[in-house]
Amino acid sequence: MAHLLHLFCIFASIMTTYQITRPKHLQTTIKLPASKSISNRALIIYALSGGAILPENLSDCDDTEVIIQALEKMPEVINIKAAGTAMRFMTAFLATTEHGEHVITGTERMQHRPIKVLVDALRRLGADIRYEQEEGFPPLRIKGRKLEGGELEVAGNISSQYISALLMVGPVLEKGLTLRLNGDIISRPYIDLTLWTMREFGADAEWTSVDTIKVEPKPYAQRPYFIESDWSAASYWYEMVALSDDPEAEVHLEGLMDGSKQGDSSVRYIFSLLGVKTIFASKTPGKPTTVTLTKSGHRVPRLEYDFVNAPDLAQTIVCTCCAMGVPFHFTGLQTLKIKETDRIKALKTELAKLGYHLEDINDCELKWDGKKETLTSHPSPLTSVAIDTYEDHRMALAFAPLAFKMPISINNPQVVTKSYPSYWKDLESSEFIIQSL
């Protein structure tokens, strides 16, 4: 009976749809979630340091929660569900520490997300990792042990999460790690974020040339650490200000930091081109503060941008530009196909429902000519279009603000718990009307 109830709850959550109605005026103050990227890195480093002082203000998102549960319980079978970051970071952690033998697995989608690059790299360092099913994909059986470390080469155009996973275990390797990245290096800000977080915990890790990183075999220090708010989460409020018809729109976002190492802090610059002004209450280095977003009244007629260093912002900016009627050509999207879903395909499919037909080039570029098709399948202007989210949190997060321009509904809205659990609550506190259909 309990099993049937569990299945019913899962089915019910999948079938839920939220209809989003915009507020008349956008005037709100939001306490953003803590940075998921920093939380996940800090947790792995916390565990590698001996786990005495838990970082403060950890993200409450699903991705971070599965890492916390895995590190606390260390079960024989570790299910990280849909958390790709957790899969990569925990694989490196389990392979390089003496915590016994474990199987690490996830959702069906996770079992089709490649991990061969990371496994091959760890094996070259001496790790004992076996595939339980299909070669190159989870689940993995890992027997942890101390590794010697040394020199290692990987391609620079792989996911930065593979590189970050290797870097973070560098200090516990007997010889440390010298990591050379061959070819073009994508998502460099995420690598820099990892190095910065490592140094916050006393690691000696730095670029020694344009393509080489040296990590010394120096143990992490155990110290208190406070995690700043998430710039990725902030991006959806930038989108709302950009799309709002309220000339006095004003959003206050708490806990953000000027000079943040988060790659997605580039959202400030991108939205300055789309009519949003960013004002910091304080610019004290290293201190979180409140950021105020207002309309600047200025926007570009066309936008070109390379998202190679901030791929998680792509869905937000694509949706914003379409709704604002700003033609675009976006590059650097090559990692979007191996995220929670094929994000390029998902964007094209869902935006086509709204009359926006995007062109993709070689699975790494998206273009839109600024033309919107007149829809005939929705006879009433009050009829909302239902957006499928493909088990991808950023689809729900990025499409909901389109309510400022058109009636919109979000299928399976609970996916936002992966990175921003309080999103719908925050919208309601900002006078959005959220109706469950």
Segments and roles (model prediction):
Residues 10-437:
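Short, structured segments at the rim of ligand-binding sites
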